[in-house]
């Protein structure tokens, strides 16, 4: 495939790959250092402080506050001013410390915001700064759309896709990768070109057609003609009656053309009907009134020149209505935005992305499902076992939330056994996989869950805990996980831990 943007070949680690994308697209970053994501903000700030500009020629800002809670709160405030992509980078306890701000970030529908995460275990009986999925799982309940890469290549590409999805869906995105195993692992990578990012994302201060009816109602339901008529109504006492009628008649007769006249080409035809002292205002009204059904790519939720309050108190009559609207009209639209962004990015780069990646699954009888860097290891082991005649496969989840039920069920339909690899003892991925499969079984007796393939029975399920705090995972441990599905098929196992009787 001759892709338009095949990428710039380099050797880079995950933190560097993400930071480079941020440097190209962000208008600002507010972050606080915490291992293993510290380098993301450091590399970004080194680029910015050296005079670096994003692909739209804007010199971005960076601010380091006194802690992770303030970093997320500040990033939220910056993102609400609109017109720019904004990020924070964090991990582990830093995410938990700022968790209340993460809930607010999602609840306010702050489009264009992306949280960059180098996933790290949350310290429990002892401190550990290595890989684990506890922090990412902690974000699930806040409502972020969550993408998860397996290597620096995917970390960079999914970073670009994250900004697109966040801006179009208005639901903030977490772009996650494994701490150290990806964030610090040097790898051959095809970095996204600046021209690709400019074309793929679009100017965050530019205008787009509202992609859903809910967004149009929120941002663009009235439009230019309505606003111009409102202006005339406020100043009608200043008009000659004949001129007032002529101005109103012109707007009525040319409503469609006026609505689309973003450059103000028609305004000159109307100036003769306006008192001289109003002509400058009228021209500004015309140019600053936006076309009906459009919005800024990254909307402004506050005006820094006219600040106001967002998120006032809502009690019994209203709060549930806001939550219902959030899920029904915004969150439910996210999967389609993700699929469209991944398809467009794949077309531009030749690097294929889908919510669920499958490897040798078509005729597989036993399959492992995982998140992050372990799936690359599992694919290598799978290839080896195939040479031994084993019908095995690997499913790598790229979209963790909203969980891609339909794609997951399609990938696992007809399999004898499935092992879910969990880099956390919370087992949230196991829960998501199991729920998706149960929906497929329910659909066998009639479509109760639209879009999800019907399956007659469930595969034997195993949860395999591995790599907590970067506990060593050897190829032989993954071989054992596949063999478990062929033999005793224990429902819960640890990989790499030895038990003594």
Positions of PLM-derived features:
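Short helix-loop-beta junction
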Residues: 46-50, 340, 380-394
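Conserved thiamine diphosphate
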Residues: 127-179, 191, 200-226, 457-468
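Flexible inter-domain linker/hinge segments
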Residues: 1-6, 226, 230-233, 243-245, ...
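Redox- and metal-dependent alpha/beta enzyme cores, enriched for Fe-S-associated oxidoreductases
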Residues: 355-390, 403-410
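Peripheral docking tails and interdomain loops at the edges
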Residues: 421-501
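Conformationally flexible catalytic loops at phosphate/diphosphate-handling active centers
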Residues: 60, 173-357
């Amino acid at each position: 495939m001759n892709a338009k943007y095949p990428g710039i070949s380099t050797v880079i680690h995950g933190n560097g790959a993400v930071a480079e994308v941020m440097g190209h697209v962000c208008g600002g970053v507010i972050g606080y250092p915490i291992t293993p994501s510290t380098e993301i903000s450091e590399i970004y700030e080194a680029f910015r402080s050296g005079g670096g500009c994003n692909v739209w020629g804007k010199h971005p800002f960076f601010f380091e506050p006194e802690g992770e809670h303030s970093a997320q709160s500040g990033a939220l405030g910056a993102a609400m001013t609109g017109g720019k992509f904004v990020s924070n980078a964090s991990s582990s306890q830093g995410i938990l410390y700022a968790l209340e701000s993460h809930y607010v970030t999602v609840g306010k529908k702050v489009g264009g915001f992306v949280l960059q995460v180098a996933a790290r275990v949350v310290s429990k009986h002892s401190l550990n700064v290595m890989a684990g999925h506890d922090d990412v799982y902690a974000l699930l309940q806040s409502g972020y759309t969550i993408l998860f890469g397996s290597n620096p290549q995917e970390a960079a590409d999914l970073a670009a896709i994250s900004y697109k999805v966040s801006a179009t869906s208005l639901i903030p995105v977490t772009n996650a990768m494994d701490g150290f195993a990806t964030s610090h692992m040097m790898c051959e990578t095809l970095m996204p070109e600046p021209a690709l990012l400019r074309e793929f994302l679009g100017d965050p201060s530019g205008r787009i057609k509202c992609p859903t009816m809910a967004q149009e109602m929120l941002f663009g339901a009235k439009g230019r003609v309505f606003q111009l008529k409102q202006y005339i109504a406020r100043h009608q006492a200043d008009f000659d009656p004949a001129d007032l009628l002529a101005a109103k008649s012109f707007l009525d007769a040319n409503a469609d053309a006026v609505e689309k006249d973003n450059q103000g080409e028609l305004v000159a035809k109307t100036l003769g009907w306006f008192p001289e002292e109003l002509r400058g205002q009228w021209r500004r009204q015309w140019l600053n009134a936006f076309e009906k059904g459009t919005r800024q790519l990254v909307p402004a939720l506050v005006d820094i020149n006219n600040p106001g309050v967002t998120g006032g108190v809502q009690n019994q009559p209203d709060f549930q209505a806001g939550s219902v609207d959030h899920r029904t009209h915004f969150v439910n639209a996210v999967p389609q935005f993700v699929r469209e962004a991944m398809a467009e990015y794949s077309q531009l780069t030749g690097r294929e992305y889908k919510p669920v990646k499958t490897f040798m699954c078509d005729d597989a009888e036993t399959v492992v499902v995982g998140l992050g860097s372990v799936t690359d290891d599992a694919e290598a082991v799978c290839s080896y076992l195939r040479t031994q005649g084993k019908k095995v496969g690997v499913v790598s989840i790229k979209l963790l939330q909203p969980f891609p039920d339909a794609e997951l069920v399609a990938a696992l339909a007809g399999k004898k056994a499935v092992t879910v690899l969990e880099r956390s003892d919370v087992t949230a991925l196991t829960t998501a996989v199991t729920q998706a499969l149960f929906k497929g079984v329910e659909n066998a007796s009639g479509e109760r869950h639209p879009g999800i393939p019907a399956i007659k029975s469930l595969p034997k399920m195993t949860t395999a805990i591995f790599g907590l705090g970067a506990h060593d995972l050897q190829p032989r441990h993954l071989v054992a996980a596949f063999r478990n599905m062929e033999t005793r098929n224990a429902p819960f196992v640890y990989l790499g831990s030895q038990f003594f009787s």
